[in-house]
Each structure stands twice: as C-alpha cells, then as structure tokens.
Amino acid sequence: MESPVRSRLQIVAAALLFSTGGAAVKAASLTGWQIASFRSGIAAVVLLAALPAARRGWNWRMLPVAVAYAATLILFVLANRLTTAANAIFLQATAPIYVLLLGPWLLHERVRRSDIFYIAAVALGLALFFAGSETAVASAPDPARGNLLALASGITYALMLAGLRWQGKHGEPDAGLKTAVAGNALAFLLALPAALPVHGFTASDAGVILYLGLFQVGLAYWCLTRAIRHVPAFEATTMLQLEPSASPFWTWMAYHESPSFRALAGGILIISATLVNTWRNRRNRAAAGKP
C-alpha cells in the first residue's frame, strides 16, 4: 500500500517539476518549435517506457484529445519564449472557465448559477492581463504575442480536459496516461517540420532538452500517476497549484524576470477563483453523497 505521506510528496514533486518548464524553456538557444518538438519526443518515449498502462487500449477517441494536448504543449513553449513565465502559466490556468463554457455543447453539462461568479472572477483576471501594455525584456521579447499564445494554450488545454471527461463517460481506463503519450508524440511530429534544420545545437541545449523531456514532463507524470489515486481530488488540485505559484519564482531566480503588477494580480485572482470553485464543487458533491 502506498504511504499517504509519500503520495503527497510525489504530487508536490510533480508540481515543482512542472513549474520549472518556463525557466528551462528560456535557457535554451533553440527556437520554440525545436524545444517543443524535441522535448515532447523524449517525453513520449519516457512515458511509454515508464507507464505500462499507457501502452494498452488505444482507440480512435484518443485522437481528438491527443491533438488538443499536443497543441497545448506547443503553444505553451512558444508562449514562454515570448512572454514571462508567469503570464504563460497564469493564462493557461484559465482553462476551467472554457470547460464550463463549452460544457453545454461538448458534454451536455449545464452552467450553474453559482458558476457565474467563477466566470466573472476569471474574466476580471484576464482583463488585468490585457489592460495596457508590457515592456519587452530579454527573456520576454514580445509579451503581447506571447500572451495571446498563452491564452490559446488555455483554450486547447480546456478542450483536452473536456475530452478526458468525455473519455471517462465512455468508461475508458487510464485515458489521461494514454493521452499524455499520444499528445507528446503528436507534438513532436507536428512541430518537427518547423524545427528543422537545426543550427548551432550546443551541449547546453542538449542538457535543457533532456531535462525537459526526462524530468519536467517524464518524471513529473510518473510521480503524478503513482500518487493521484491515493490522494483526495481537492487536496491534489490544491497541491498542484504549486506549479503556477512556483513558475514565476524560478524565472525570477534565473533571469530576474518579474511579471507586471497587473499580471500578478490577475494571476492570483484566477488561481484563487479556481481553488474556491474546486472547493465549492467538492462540498456540493459531498452534500449530494457523490465521491
């Protein structure tokens, strides 16, 4: 039996590994397309080797979900090359609002009156991001374009989450694991044409790519999949919020990159609203006698 303490430490480790993605992406001299392709290629191999459950039961329903995840992986890397890591992760964290808005059409799940407050809070957070302009710096040379790419990654991430829920309704086991493998494999293939040819590939670049594929994605997913079934959903969700919280810290340490006050306020509002909404949903499910 898995130790409760060990399971929680594994989720914390996964969140912290995920959070280093922004800083690591900025460390390579490669293009965003090259980083996205090579990182995902390594991650797909690692996940396939490390997670036996990801090798079984593939079917056509995986494809649209894997495409959405592949787009998320690519867009997130491209966004991190152009805007601050804080902006990239905070804007991607808006995904739950799109899941709510798409729910009536994709999942036949209605938007409840109580969800309106969450939608309004996230909308206000988004408004703070896009009000005014941000100054370009070496680690974030085109914040406006990067913010749009990060926003797009939030939408594709929402499509992936909705797809996983759709797969779950069809009783598919380990859908998340298989999607992680297929999505990374697709991201590798889709970004590869734009990644070639490669010029000036250094030992430092190789180290960054290996770290991203082996640890930031591969080991993080291994920790998460080992632990997630042993930790209550709300507790796991709360611990995984370490990712958007820690990501700006790593880039500040490495590059002295600081998000604007507006972006920081918007990010805190989005994360706080998500946590409150998750807690409220958990309480409502408990009151209804649902797991």
Where are these regions (language model features)?
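Glycine-/small-residue-enriched transmembrane alpha-helix faces in small-molecule transporters
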Residues: 1-37, 67, 75, 124, ...
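Juxtamembrane helix-entry segments on the extracytoplasmic side of multipass membrane proteins
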Residues: 4-7, 29-37, 55-59, 131-156, ...
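Helix-helix packing/entry segments at the starts of transmembrane helices
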Residues: 9, 88-94, 164-186, 217-253
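Transmembrane alpha-helical segments that form core, pore/gating elements
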Residues: 15, 47, 99-100, 136-198, ...
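Specific transmembrane alpha-helical segments of multi-pass solute transporters/efflux pumps
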Residues: 17-22, 53-92, 100, 124, ...
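Hydrophobic/aromatic residues within transmembrane alpha-helices
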Residues: 28, 35, 79, 105-107, ...
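Specific alpha-helical transmembrane segments that line the substrate/conduction pathway
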Residues: 34-37, 41-45, 77-110, 114-116, ...
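Hydrophobic transmembrane alpha-helices of multi-pass small-molecule transport proteins
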Residues: 47, 69, 101, 114-134, ...
